[in-house]
């Protein structure tokens, strides 16, 4: 919680400046800064990441961006400086198909594509993501809004794990990033590694990450949350949801809507998708799914 002290101090100084200002423009600017930092302080005190209204595609509404310009500008300058002088590379490969990074910029897209990354998990709340860039470059993008130095709620963390598993299962390289690549992104990556390695301890998962990214370091709040989630068995993934689709029936709606369906279901289920062909019927695929332990099967098409 130490970071909130700086926001509170900044808000107080801004309102003091407003109180003693005789210039209307300085007064307006001081009020703007004071209001922005006050709202940010409240967000941190009460753990309200939604205050930034960041959407799952990483975008923040225009009016929110203007309200928080003093904070967002300061945050961007700090992130840029910290990244430039960081001891480790901005993007690092932790596991096959799994990368860890600090704040990403559009200039990072070619590097990600060269590394085989086609999906981005953004675990920040306080700044715009690569929403338009990712869409233009056909990258899958998902935002899990978490405030700096905080940990996600259990249900939100589970969404991230399912989303990661669905993309990695389909041979997509995935990068998880926060502001500095040290806390929030490390927590989510450790949670995913624990879901894939049930016999591991929290310490083993963190050691795996820190062996590559030396600056990875959870604070006390984040470490306590990760250990609690692990003890509660949160990372035990449920039985997959199977989808059997006929791509030509229903006027061919499945190919048109497939990407959206996957996007909507990925944060909630492990997806196994099978498609019928001229020589493979839905009945054959259904039996195949049952033989592999399927408990829930959804038929699409027609």
Question: What function would you assign to each model-found segment?
Answer:
Residues 2-132, 211-237:
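Cys-based phosphatase fold recognition centered on the PTP superfamily
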Residues 81-173, 197, 204, 217-223, ...:
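Cysteine-based protein phosphatase catalytic domain of the PTP/DSP
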Residues 123-124, 245, 301:
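Glycine-rich, N-terminal phosphate-binding loop of Rossmann-like dinucleotide-binding domains
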Residues 137, 230-297:
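ATP/NTP phosphate-donor binding region
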Residues 171-190, 297-302:
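A phosphate-binding catalytic loop at a beta-strand-loop-alpha-helix junction
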Residues 188-193, 286:
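Buried hydrophobic packing segments
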């Amino acid at each position: 919680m130490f970071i909130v002290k700086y926001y509170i101090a900044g808000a107080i100084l801004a309102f003091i400046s407003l109180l003693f200002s005789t210039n209307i423009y300085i007064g307006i600017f001081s009020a703007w800064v004071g209001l922005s930092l006050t709202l940010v302080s409240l967000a941190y005190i009460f753990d309200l990441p939604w205050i930034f209204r960041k959407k799952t595609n990483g975008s923040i509404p225009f009016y929110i961006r203007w309200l928080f310009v003093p904070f967002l500008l300061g945050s961007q300058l700090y992130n840029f400086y910290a990244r430039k002088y960081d001891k480790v590379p901005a993007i690092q490969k932790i596991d096959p198909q799994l990368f860890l990074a600090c704040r990403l910029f559009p200039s990072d897209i070619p590097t990600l594509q060269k590394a085989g990354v086609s999906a981005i998990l953004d675990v920040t709340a306080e700044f715009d993501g690569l929403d338009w860039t990712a869409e233009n470059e056909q990258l899958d993008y998902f935002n899990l809004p978490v405030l700096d130095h905080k940990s996600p709620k259990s249900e939100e963390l589970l969404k991230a794990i399912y989303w990661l598993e669905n993309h990695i299962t389909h041979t997509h390289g995935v990068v998880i990033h926060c502001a500095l690549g040290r806390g929030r992104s490390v927590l989510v990556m450790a949670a995913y590694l624990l879901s894939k390695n049930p016999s591991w301890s929290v310490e083993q998962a963190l050691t795996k990450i820190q062996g590559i990214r030396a600056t990875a370091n959870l604070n006390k709040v984040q470490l306590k949350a990760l250990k609690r989630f692990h003890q509660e068995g949160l990372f035990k993934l449920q039985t997959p949801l199977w989808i059997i689709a006929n791509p030509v029936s229903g006027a061919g709606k499945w190919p048109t809507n497939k990407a959206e369906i996957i996007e909507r279901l990925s944060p909630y289920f492990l997806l196994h998708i099978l498609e019928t062909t001229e020589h493979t019927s839905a009945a054959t695929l259904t039996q195949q799914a049952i033989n592999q332990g399927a408990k829930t099967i959804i038929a699409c098409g027609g």
